[in-house]
Amino acid sequence: AIGGSINLVTKSTPYKRTFSATAGTGYNWVSEKAQLNLGLTYGDRFFNNKLGVMAAISYQNAPVGSDDVEFEYDVNKKGEVVMVEAQKRQYYVTRERQSYSLAFDYDINPNHRLTLQGIYNRRHDWENRYRVTYKDLDKTGLDDEGEMQQSAQIETKGGTPNNKNARLELQQTMDFSLGGEHQFGKLSMDWGASYARATEDRPNERYFNLKQDFLGFDVVDAGDRFPYVTTDVSLHNGKADGERGKWKVKELTESNQEIYENDLKFKVNFELPLTNGIYGNSLKFGAKYVSKTKDRDVICYDYADAYKDTYDTEYMNNLTSQIRDGFMPGSQYKATDFVSKEYLGSLNLANMEGEQVLEESSGNYHAKENVTSAFFRFDQNLGKKIKMMLGLRMEATHIKYNGWNWNVDENEDESLEPTGDHKNDYVNWLPSVLFKYDVNDDFKVRASFTETLSRPKYSALIPCVNINRSDNKLVMGNPDLTPTISYNFDLS
């Protein structure tokens, strides 16, 4: 199945005129900046209370940050748990959120009512991350050539100047729905139609990663909550040790990512009382149609080789010290020089020849899923204390997916090929039975049987085959997967 469900709640229309305005602020000790929160709501009824209107807007600007350390452990050949990697990270994030909602309801007469609702949310996340990684910490001692086996990486995450030299993640969601409730004699009817769209854009996301090999580290308090490496790493060390000991540009990448999902729904439900009394019964029936599409498009290029040929070590003139004073995990984590976000953002990558990172594009896909369903439910009173409900639901699912096959051979030569469209159709019948027995006002017994389904997640359905023979890794999707069926018995 594509995604899940997101319940975007709009403010309901009021019974009388209402107005409210809110304002708030706060302070983040990491970013050392103030936050701002604003909100405005207005609602009223018009035309002799037949038309209700509710409008609301809100705005939030929150410059925040975080101090972070992360550790990775593994079990060695002796069965011992050893640390293999340690990281210290400094984050600075500014989140700006805007929300707009509008709701209407119109009472045509006591038997007919219409509703219209809409909501739009827009969120910007500007993030910079500074990360030091100590790798291969389990490889102590010297290798066969007498060299130390550990390494360090220093990385800056950012973006272009038009995005504040930060990684921008722009998420937008919108949801518009139209519905009605109607009474035709004994027959009750409700219906609804809705359109929703969610997008995520991450333009010009950049990483500058520097690596130094042939290092040896001492780790203190390994296995505790806050272990740390006592050996400082610095971009100013290693330049005089020759080619084997110098810092190298391991990665200079820029990626552009677009993800969007569209969701279209129609539904109609009916309820008809058949007879009244202690043996009364009623019938409910309806239908629903859901059409979803989801697309992921990521393209990434690595400019590390082009940078080295053009600029060599120019980055050394554009450094910034991070891992702030007061770093919350502890003062044992020292400040380090990183490539500045301003320098990373200023690089004109359009003038460099980059190499496409095919692995990043191997996860691209187009997915379409249509589900048509219908149901009926029969409610029957079996005297004053027993009630029975019988139901049956039919769901017809039609899916179409396409993706990419990524292949890496033993020589690490890569290729990326489209999979073409893969389709799958199936129908599920889902019965349900429920009995309810009211022994008295304080004691009630329920027994039920239901058949339900759980569809595979969309990422498992993408018809991709990613083979990396150099690392002996294989990842496959299967568009022919069908839902998991469960039979549920309940007594309460």
Label for each model-derived stretch:
Residues 2-23, 36-40:
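N-terminal periplasmic accessory domains that precede
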Residues 4, 36-40, 98-102, 172-178, ...:
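Hydrophobic, lipid-facing positions within transmembrane beta-strands of outer-membrane proteins
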Residues 13-18, 47-51, 111, 186-188, ...:
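Short loop/turn motifs that connect adjacent beta-strands in outer-membrane beta-barrel proteins
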Residues 17-21, 51-55, 114-116, 178, ...:
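Transmembrane beta-strands of outer-membrane beta-barrel proteins
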Residues 25-29, 59-63, 120-124, 134, ...:
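Transmembrane beta-strands of outer-membrane beta-barrel pores
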Residues 33-136, 161, 171-178, 185, ...:
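Transmembrane beta-barrel wall of Gram-negative outer-membrane proteins
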Residues 146-158, 218-251, 302-363:
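Flexible glycine-rich, low-complexity coil/linker segments exposed to the extracellular/periplasmic environment
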Residues 156-175, 359, 363-370, 424, ...:
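Outer-membrane beta-barrel signature, preferentially recognizing the C-terminal barrel domain
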